From Swiss-Prot:
Keywords: Cytolysis, Dermonecrotic toxin, Disulfide bond, Hemolysis, Lipid degradation, Lipid metabolism, Lyase, Magnesium, Metal-binding, Secreted, Toxin. The lineage of its organism: Eukaryota, Metazoa, Ecdysozoa, Arthropoda, Chelicerata. It is found in: Secreted. The active site is at H3, H39. This is Dermonecrotic toxin LhSicTox-alphaIA2aiv. It comes from Loxosceles hirsuta. One of its GO terms (cellular component) is extracellular region. Expressed by the venom gland. Disulfide bonds join C43-C49, C45-C188. Belongs to the arthropod phospholipase D family. Class II subfamily.
Length: 271
C-alpha cells in the first residue's frame, strides 16, 4: 500500500513504483462533510505533509485510475484505504459523516453505479467510539438503491486498540466480515510486532473477526522481512519499490506475491 497518497498525480507515482493499493487521508469540515484529501503536520519522516486535493475531485481522479477503458486506468491498483480523520468530529457526528461519505463515493467514485471505479475500498476509522460511521455509511448505500456496492467495502479500526475491544466495536456496528486490521506507527518511531502477531492469530483462529492484517509504516528492508515473517497480508509504505525488492528475495519469492483484482480482499488466505 502506498502511504499518504493525497494528490491525484501521486496515484500514478506510487503505482508505477510497484504499489497495488494506496492509502488516502480524508479530512472533514465542521458539518461532517468529507472535505480534503489531506494529512497535515506532523507526518512520516521524509515526506511532505501538506499535499491535498478537494475530496470530490480526488474521487474523480481515482475513478479514472480504476475504471477499465479510461486513458488513466491503472490495472494494478485494486484497493484504496481511506484514512478517515474523524478526530475533528464530535462522537455524535460519526453517523452523519458515514452518510455523507457514502453519498460522495456513490456520486463521484462509483458514478451512481454506472461503470464507476472498480477498486475495493477500506474505511479506516481511528476511534472505536466512531463505529456509528459504519452504519451511517451502509444504511445510506442501501437507501440510495445500491446495496451491491457494499461488496466492494471493508472496514478497519486504526487506533491500535486491544483486539478484544475492536471486536466489540464491530459487533455494535453490525459488521461480520470484510475486516482489515491495521497495526503500526509513524516511520519516525519504532514499534514491535506483538499486536500484529495477536491479530494474525485472531485471523487464523477460524472464529476471529479479522480477515486481513496490515502493518504500517514499513520503509526498511529489515522491517519488511519481519512483517512478512509475522504473516501479515499487507504493508503500508512510503517506498513501494523497497517492498517489491524484498518480495523478490529468495526467501519470499515463492511464498508471497502482489494481490491482483481476482483475489478477494475479504477472504482469509489459507496457507
Amino acid at each position: 500500500m502506498g502511504h499518504m497518497v493525497n494528490a491525484i498525480y501521486q496515484i500514478d507515482e506510487f503505482v508505477n513504483l510497484g504499489a497495488n493499493s494506496i492509502e488516502t487521508d480524508v479530512s472533514f469540515d465542521d458539518n461532517a462533510n468529507p472535505e480534503y484529501t489531506h494529512h497535515g503536520i506532523p507526518c512520516d519522516c521524509g515526506r511532505s505533509c501538506l499535499k491535498w486535493k478537494n475530496y470530490n475531485d480526488f474521487l474523480k481522479g481515482l475513478r479514472s485510475a480504476t475504471t477499465p477503458g479510461n486513458s488513466k486506468y491503472q490495472s494494478k491498483l485494486i484497493l484504496v484505504v481511506f484514512d478517515l480523520k474523524t478526530g475533528s468530529l464530535y462522537d455524535n457526528q460519526a453517523s452523519e459523516a458515514g452518510k455523507k461519505l457514502a453519498k460522495n463515493l456513490l456520486k463521484h467514485y462509483w458514478n451512481n453505479g454506472n461503470n464507476g471505479g472498480r477498486a475495493y475500498i477500506v474505511l479506516s476509522i481511528p476511534d472505536l467510539n466512531h463505529y456509528p460511521l459504519i452504519k451511517g455509511f451502509t444504511d445510506t448505500l442501501k437507501q440510495e438503491g445500491h446495496p451491491e456496492l457494499l461488496e466492494k467495502v471493508g472496514y478497519d479500526f486504526s487506533g491500535n486498540d486491544a483486539v478484544g475491544d475492536v471486536a466489540k466495536a464491530y459487533k455494535k456496528a453490525g459488521v461480520s466480515g470484510h475486516v482489515w486490521q491495521s497495526d503500526g506507527i509513524t516511520n519516525c518511531l519504532l514499534r514491535g510486532l506483538t499486536r500484529v502477531k495477536e491479530a494474525v492469530a485472531n485471523r487464523d483462529s477460524g472464529n476471529g473477526y479479522i480477515n486481513k492484517v496490515y502493518y504500517w509504516t514499513v520503509d526498511k528492508r529489515a522491517t519488511t522481512r519481519d512483517a512478512l515473517d509475522a504473516g501479515v497480508d499487507g504493508v503500508m509504505t512510503n517506498y513501494p519499490d523497497v517492498i517489491a525488492d524484498v518480495m523478490s528475495e529468495a526467501a519470499y519469492k515463492n511464498k508471497v506475491r502482489l494481490a491482483t483484482y481476482e483475489d478477494s480482499p475479504w477472504v482469509t488466505f489459507k496457507k
